[in-house]
Amino acid sequence: MNALAQKTPSPPTLVFTEAAVRKVKGLIDEENNPYLNLRVFITGGGCSGFQYGFTFDEAINSDDLVIEKQLEEEDDDEGGTGQMALVKLLVDPLSLQYLQGAEIDYREDVSGAQFVIRNPNAKTTCGCGSSFAA
């Protein structure tokens, strides 16, 4: 059998949903600094062993995974302005090991608004969803 025929497409490294992109764009606009990027990282701690972190960062390290998403600028009236904005998500290599295949989303509901990470690598998660065990 041909080795190429057995090759399956690899899943996306990380999914950055449109809702998350729009929220990040809004937060960057509030800071009035177009050079900001959203950095997602993993640190030790939390009730399950690891916890997610989010911060804004102007610096892009040479070994960062950079996910770029284009988003049409919204207008106060109807629809968009036709101009495109670029939003970047940054992940360092160590954190990427734990975030491979995860989805970063933004959710608003009756309980509040927050960034949500759906992580297929998490074996267990805490009730609040901000920490996990791998």
From Swiss-Prot:
Function: Required for insertion of 4Fe-4S clusters for at least IspG.
GO CC annotation: cytosol
Name of this protein: Iron-sulfur cluster insertion protein ErpA
Source organism of the structure: Coxiella burnetii (strain RSA 493 / Nine Mile phase I)
Keyword Transferase in annotation: no
InterPro entries given in the database record: FeS_biogenesis, FeS_cluster_insertion, FeS_cluster_insertion_CS, FeS_cluster_insertion_RrpA, HesB-like_dom_sf
GO molecular function, one term: iron ion binding
Residues that bind iron-sulfur cluster: C47, C126, C128
Highest classification ranks of the organism: Bacteria, Pseudomonadati, Pseudomonadota, Gammaproteobacteria, Legionellales
